[in-house]
Amino acid sequence: MTKLLSYINTSEDLKHLSTEDLNKLAEELREFLISSISITGGHLAPNLGVVELTLAIHKVFSPIQDKIVWDVGHQSYIHKILTGRKEQFSTLRQFGGLSGFPKPEESRYDAFGTGHSSTSISAALGMAKARDLQGSNEEVLAVIGDGAMTGGMAFEAMNHAGHEQANMTVILNDNEMSIGTNVGALSSYLSRLRTDPKYHRIKEDVEFLLKRIPAIGGKMMKSVERVKDSMKYLMVSGMLFEELGFTYIGPIDGHNIPQLMEVLNNAKDKNGPVLVHVITKKGKGYEPAEKFPDKFHGTGPFEIETGNAPKKAETAPSYSKVFGDTISEIARKNESVVAITAAMKDGTGLTNFAREFPERFFDVGIAEQHAITFAAGLARKGFKPVVAIYSTFLQRAYDQIIHDVCMQDNPVIFAIDRAGIVGGDGETHQGLYDLSYLRSIPNLIVMAPKDEAELQRMLNTAVNINKPVAIRYPRGKGEGVTLWENMTPIPLYKGETIREGSQVAMIGVGKMVPDMLEVADMLKKEGIEPTVFNARFVKPLDESSILEIAQKHEYIYTFEENTELGGFGSQVLECLSKHGLAHKLIDRFCLPDEYIPHGDRSKVLSQYSLHSQELINKILNRLRGEQIEQG
C-alpha cells in the first residue's frame, strides 16, 4: 500500500486530506523521522512531539504566504519535510546538507532563521508590524517551546506585543505538562468557549443587559466579575499572558488534530495577540524517546529496536566530562566553589556536580544575562562562581561580562564549552567569536588549553586567581592524554615551547595546538624543523616569549579556531607590530569573516584550507617560493 507521505511534496498537498488521513500521515511522519534520524542523528524527541501540531499549522495556515517563526528551531523537522525537503532529509546536519534549524537561504518556507532561544516572538511581532505598515494581510505565528519561554527576551517581546495589540498568534508548545481526562475535557470546553466569537458576543450582550437593570444591575455585574475573576485565577498560567495583553487559549491537546485546527482557525479571527497553549509529549510514538526524552533531545545515530547508540571503542573522555569531573574535585576541597549553568546542566558536564553539591549548583534556565550577573553577586560575597556555558550563548551576556563582572573585577570563572567548530548545529552555534569579543575587555584573563589535561590545570589556576577568568575549550573528545592527579597550576601568563626548531615558528592556542604538532611532524619529513609554541594565554599575551621567537625565526604562523577579525592571530600581529616585527608574521590560520556552515570539523577545515595537509602546502609553497626568488 502506497504511503500518504509519498504524495506530500508541499504543504498545499495537505489541504484535501481528511482528519483520518492526517492521523495516518502523522504515524508515517514519525516512522520517517525515526528511520532517518537513526542514521544521521539530530533532534528526535522534540520533533516527535510536534507532528500533529505542525500538521495542523500547515493545514490551517499557508506557510508560503503566512509567516511561521520556530523557536528554538530544532523542532522544525516536520515543517521541513512538508515543504519540499523530504528527499534531502538524509543529509540533515551533514556538510553541504540540510540545516537542523530554519534557514531562509534554504527554503522560502522558512520565514526567519533561528537557533538561539526566545527570539521568535520579537521576530514575529516585527513581521506583524511590518505587515500592518505595508497594508498586507498575512498571518504571523511564533511557535515557542516552554523552555524557550523562560528566556527574558520572550517576555520583553510579549510585553511589547500586548502594548501594540498586533494581530499575531503565539503557540506555546508545552511538553512538560500532561493533561488528565477531566482537566483535558474542561480545558477543551473552556477553550472552545473562549475562541468562539459567539461566546464573546453573548458575554458582551449579557454585560450590557445587566448594567441596564435598575438598582441591582451593578451589583449583579460585580458578582459576575468576581465569578469570572475566580475562574480566571484558577488558570494562573493563562493569567500571566492575559495581563500582558494576550488572549489566552488553552491548554489544548497538542496531539488532537481536529481540536488544534478548530482552535487555530478561531485564533486567526481574533483581534490583538493570541497565545495558544498546547500540551505535547516529547518523544511521542517512540518508546525509548518517551522514556528518555532528554537522551533523545539531541542524539547521534542509534539502533531503532533498542534506542541504543552503536558501540564504539573506548576513546578519550570529552572536554565537557573532564571539566565536570575536575570542577567537582576542586569543589570537594574548596567550599567557595559554586557552579552555574543556563539550562545546560548535562551538556556542560555538570550533572554529577549538581548531584554531589545540590546547594552549590544553580541552573538559572535560559537566562544567560541573569546567570552572569548572578555569578558576579556571588563573587562579590566571597564565592568562586564557575559559569559553564557554550561559547555561542555567552554572546548573549556581553554587557553583563563587561559591566557586572570585569568592570568590578569580580572573580567569576567562565568555563566556555563548544568553542570553535561545533559540527551539525552550524552557523547559529559555532563558537568562533569568543576570543575576539573577550580579549577587548579589561581585567579579563583568557586561556585556551591544548588538551584535556591542560584544561584541568587551567581550572585549578583560575580558582586560585582573584580575577575574572575565561577558559575556552572545544566540543567533543579530548586528545587522549593522561590526566593529572594533582593538577598543579600553570605559570601565570606564560606559554610553553613544545618543540624547539629554526626558521619556521608556529604559535597557536587551544584545539589547534595538536593540529600544529601534526603539521610539524609532516614538515619534519620535508627536512624542516619548526618551533611549536603553545601560547596558553590569549590575554594577557606572553609577549616576551613571542618577541623572542620572532627575533630567532624568519617565518611565523599563528593557529586558532576563531574568526580572523580580532582573534589570537590579530593579537600576535599587534604585538609584533609594536616592535617593528610585523613582517615576520606570514599567515594567520583561522576561520574567515563569514558564517561557517554545519558539518564535520574535518570537512569544515578542508573547506577553508585549514586541514593539516593544506596548511603544510601553504607553508612549503612559501618557503620554496622564497628559495626560488633567492636562487
Curated annotation (Swiss-Prot):
Catalytic activity: D-glyceraldehyde 3-phosphate + pyruvate + H(+) = 1-deoxy-D-xylulose 5-phosphate + CO2
GO cellular component, one term: cytosol
Binding site for thiamine diphosphate: 74, 115-117, 147-148, 175, 286, 368
Annotated Gene3D superfamilies: 3.40.50.920, 3.40.50.970
Membership in a protein family: Belongs to the transketolase family. DXPS subfamily.
Function: Catalyzes the acyloin condensation reaction between C atoms 2 and 3 of pyruvate and glyceraldehyde 3-phosphate to yield 1-deoxy-D-xylulose-5-phosphate (DXP).
Full protein name: 1-deoxy-D-xylulose-5-phosphate synthase
Species this chain originates from: Natranaerobius thermophilus (strain ATCC BAA-1301 / DSM 18059 / JW/NM-WN-LF)
Gene from which this protein is expressed: dxs
